[in-house]
Amino acid sequence: FACNSSPRFTNVPVSFVCLGQSFTFNHGVTDPDGDSLVYSLVNPMRNSTDSIPFVSGYSATNPITSVPALSINTANGDISMTPTQVEVGVLSVLIKEYRNGVLVGSVVRDMEVYVRMCNNNLPSESGINGTNIRDRTICPGTLICFDIMSNDVDSSQLVTMTWNQGITGATFSVSGTPHPTGNFCWTSPTAVVGTQVFSFIVTVRDDACPNSGFQTYSYNISVRSPINALSLTPISCNGAADGSATVVVSNPPGTYTYAWTPGGQTTQTISAQGPGSDTVFVTDTATG
């Protein structure tokens, strides 16, 4: 695809994972072109054409013995597992790039995972403002700020919090000890066509010896351009019901669905049914 930049990895592939502990990792992928990224697990490749087969009981989507089963979030790339067996596994992550719903490129990254016994509890971090939510949708030109909290069951350990500077122009300040809080702030760009996703990752790491424990999570902000216009045809006279309203969406071009309330109409245009107010929800079928 002409004029396409490949996704970039900002996090080192994980090496060691603790037996019996819930663990989340993210490669910290950024895309210079702002393309939409979709993640999946695939077979590792021996060369450009041949994949490496797994032994019985294992597969590309089940490379590590884990309860619940190892999983990858297809939207943000978070890999989650709770290993139940000391072993070594290989994960291959395929990242596909989409631009306006069209596949423009892909890249694969392998990582080797060693599951071992640990005498240390991994640190953890919250979602946005202490919740479990790590995704937000905002309009262009909007200021968004939120906190991310860290924690560690081993209360005597010192936890550090870092981010990968994944969003240009954003700030991330860390304060507090031994379990710091990170504050993220950013004003979204005003020139956004359709929906563009901006992502960053945050890593929390303790000071356990001889090997520190860590986890990495992704945070994703979708910037979605608003509806361009609403075309109205006024009623011809007082008491008439011959007016209409039409939703006009031209940025970006695409296929949309419509849901009006009250009334339940699903057309782009509705005719006046009498006095009152109407609300319309517009959904881009390509991005949801």
Question: Residues of each region from the PLM?
Answer:
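Solvent-exposed loop segments of extracellular immunoglobulin-like
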Residues: 23, 31-45, 154-163, 249-259
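Proline- and Ser/Thr-rich low-complexity, intrinsically disordered segments
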Residues: 123-126, 222-288
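A short beta-strand micro-motif common to beta-rich folds, especially ectodomain repeats
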Residues: 88-99, 196-207
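Surface-exposed, flexible coil segments in extracellular/virion-facing regions
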Residues: 45-69, 74-80, 166-185, 258-273
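Short, solvent-exposed loop/turn segments at the edges of extracellular beta-sandwich modules
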Residues: 96-104, 205-212, 283-288
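Solvent-exposed segments in extracellular or luminal domains encompassing
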Residues: 81-85, 180, 187-197, 267-284
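Extracellular interdomain linkers/hinges and stalk-like, low-complexity segments
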Residues: 1-34, 102-153, 212-233
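Extracellular Ig-like/FN3 beta-sandwich strand-entry sites
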Residues: 22, 86-90, 143, 181, ...
